[in-house]
């Protein structure tokens, strides 16, 4: 996923994209001005109504049309990965350019129509067929952290299942969303004659979200975002598939290979400056493993900051609010060098991640901070590590990671934390099929229990029974 682009390559990509933004191919300052024939609408109600028409057209095209739409989205996303990744990086100003590009290049791994196969049973009393049928129009909320990747992944899953979709993207990534959705729709219309299969609000607001959620044209909602938007979706009155917040803990014990554990944690936690919801957010290491493990962190691209620097950074990142801590957004997804300067330190431009020793109640441990600064908590033993990890995970039931060669300990942590995603002896990204087995998705429905989404997530099971006939034996 990491392209290892050098600084000159990064500058060239950004310069090229900014030039296009300033020229005839630029995204407009008000995305709603895009032609509605490209699926971009000024409000939620009109976008939902148009998507309903797009759904009707898709139904006429059958599974072949679904398959072609999936192929269009995958091929366009991969072929435009450098330009679109740079566009999103320039718009959102968070994460790492090479990882923005990488997230788009791997969209081809998202499962499509091949996942939608019926189940059939035959017996003395006839036959039964169960099919995975579409809902119709799905309303989708997408985050600023992964604007185009989440949109592309959602489209692939949802259209493969036979649905249309209307997006209310995060305002911070709306230009990227509009650019990609407009391009997809143009190619879908050119090749299939289907219009408005993928719709989007060009000026997304709370009001446009509410209009989508309340629209009679929308059957279900799919939410990828923080606790606030998930809570709102739960009150919409519609079935909601919610990919909520996480704060993934890591346990490293004395049986683990310290170098491999350090390298894996850096690979997962530093990816896109730790914007991934599955990314390693806090580490609990046993006393017996601590020295060797932290030495390997330093040897492999992470840099330790002092307690004084940590205090200064903490004051920049968090504010006390309602008896707890609230995250200030200014440093979310920023490079470790930016974080170091905020902490009053200077570090190598090659540094991938910062780390600091903290106690288990430090705000960097308890709050999901989404930046490449990982707190390391030294604990007496594995039992203490599990208790602390469970507290830090906050019952989000999202993701957790362990580095250990003790299978009993792996099992204990998995049972206690009860997360949707649990990775053993690998980077967090292995949980989505990147260096591990399985399939890719950018929406992990933790809050509502569907898990890592795939086309079947967006279907309803329908049963058809024939009594006394058609069983041919």
What are the language-model segments listed below?
Residues 345-473:
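Conserved C-terminal structural/oligomerization subdomain of aldehyde/semialdehyde dehydrogenase
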Residues 38, 152, 230-353, 359-360:
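ALDH superfamily catalytic-core signature
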Residues 2-129, 157, 299:
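N-terminal Rossmann-like NAD(P)+-binding subdomain of aldehyde/semialdehyde dehydrogenases
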Residues 63-67, 192-198, 271-277, 303-313, ...:
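Flexible, glycine/charged-enriched surface loops at secondary-structure junctions
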Residues 118-260:
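Rossmann-like NAD(P) dinucleotide-binding subdomain of oxidoreductase/dehydrogenase enzymes
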């Amino acid at each position: 996923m990491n392209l290892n682009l050098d600084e000159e390559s990064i500058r060239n990509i950004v310069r090229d994209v900014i030039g296009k933004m300033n020229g005839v191919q630029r995204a407009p300052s008000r995305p709603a001005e895009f032609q509605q024939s490209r699926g971009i609408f000024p409000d939620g109600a009109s976008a939902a109504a148009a998507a309903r028409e797009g759904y009707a057209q898709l139904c006429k095209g059958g599974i072949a049309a679904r398959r072609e739409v999936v192929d269009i989205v995958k091929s366009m996303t991969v072929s435009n990965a450098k330009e679109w990744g740079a566009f999103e990086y320039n718009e959102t100003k968070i994460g790492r350019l090479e990882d923005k590009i990488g997230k788009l290049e791997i969209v081809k791994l998202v499962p499509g129509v091949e996942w939608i196969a019926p189940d059939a049973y035959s017996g003395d009393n006839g036959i039964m067929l169960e099919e995975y049928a579409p809902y119709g129009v799905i309303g989708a909320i997408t985050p600023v952290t992964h604007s185009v990747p989440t949109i592309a992944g959602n489209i692939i899953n949802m259209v493969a299942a036979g649905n249309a979709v209307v997006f209310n993207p995060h305002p911070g990534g709306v230009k990227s969303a509009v650019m990609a959705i407009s391009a997809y729709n143009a190619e879908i219309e050119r090749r299939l004659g289907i219009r408005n299969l993928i719709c989007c609000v060009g000026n997304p607001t709370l009001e446009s979200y509410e209009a989508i959620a309340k629209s009679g044209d929308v059957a279900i909602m799919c939410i990828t975002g923080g606790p606030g938007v998930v809570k709102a979706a739960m009150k919409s009155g519609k079935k909601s598939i919610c990919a909520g917040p996480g704060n993934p803990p890591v346990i490293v014990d004395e049986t683990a290979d310290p170098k491999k554990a350090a390298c894996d944690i850096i690979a997962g936690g530093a990816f896109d400056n730790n914007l991934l919801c599955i990314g390693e957010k806090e580490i609990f290491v046993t006393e017996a493993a601590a020295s060797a493990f932290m030495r390997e962190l330093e040897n492999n691209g992470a840099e330790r900051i002092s307690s004084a620097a940590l205090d200064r950074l903490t004051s920049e990142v968090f504010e006390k609010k309602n008896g707890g801590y609230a995250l200030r957004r200014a440093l979310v997804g920023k490079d470790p060098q930016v974080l170091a300067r905020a902490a009053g330190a200077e570090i190598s431009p090659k540094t991938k991640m910062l780390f600091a020793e903290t106690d288990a109640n430090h705000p960097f441990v308890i709050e999901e901070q989404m930046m490449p600064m990982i707190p390391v908590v030294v604990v007496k033993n594995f039992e203490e590590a599990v208790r602390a990890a469970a507290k830090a995970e906050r019952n989000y039931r999202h993701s957790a990671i362990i580095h250990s060669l003790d299978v009993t300990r792996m099992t204990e942590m998995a049972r206690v934390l009860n997360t949707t995603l649990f990775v053993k002896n690998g980077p967090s990204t292995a949980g989505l099929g990147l260096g591990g087995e399985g399939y890719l998705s950018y929406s992990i429905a933790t809050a509502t229990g569907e898990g890592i989404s795939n086309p079947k997530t967006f279907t309803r099971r329908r049963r058809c029974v024939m009594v006394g006939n058609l069983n041919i034996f």
